[in-house]
Amino acid sequence: MFKKLIAGILISSFSLGSTYASELSEKTNIVRIMNNYITSISCMNDKVQLKDIFTIDKPSENGSTYYVLWNGDIGCNGGTGTHSYYVSEVSRFSPNRPLLVTTNDAFGDNNEAFWNADKASINYRFIQSMKQISPSEFEIVSYAYADDKFGGVDRGNMGPANKFRYTVSFIEDEGWKITKQVLLEQNK
């Protein structure tokens, strides 16, 4: 009985270790893939590091999904408002398929159609930090321009008035949504 228990524990620890190694191995590959990708589509970018990669779906027989925070000037336009942060989705649809960058808008709110819908959104140009709370919840700190709801005084194109902490949650059948917005600082 004791030998079976020890054998079970050892087998479990090996399988957990191999899952972790697979996830770390994929993240290491994603660093290389993303750095090649962002260099090919943008200028003035910082290199992606392991800390910029967030696991959404761990490697399994159904594939895996990661979100990657990075910054750059897509298209190399060189304007004062063209450099931004992005959250890209990198997925593998099965263990024997390659990792693919599937979008630069993983949360679905960094696009003109969403901005024109007059919904609360994150200003990706001014992201300060992104922290994963769980696979379905993130905390993002970013600045935003003054508006009727929060007020504040902007200081030009590069000086938005308000600093917020956003909680972004995945809601079943709705997708990613801002579920909490807390004002941290304000220019008056």
Q: Which residues does each predicted region cover?
A:
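Sec-dependent N-terminal signal peptides
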Residues: 4-15
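Composition- and surface-driven signal marking solvent-exposed, interaction-prone regions
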Residues: 1-4, 181-183
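Terminal domain-start segments
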Residues: 19-65, 175-188
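Acidic, small-residue rich beta-repeat scaffolds with periodic aromatic anchors
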Residues: 22-27, 121-188
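Surface-exposed acidic loop/strand-edge motifs in secreted or periplasmic proteins
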Residues: 48-123
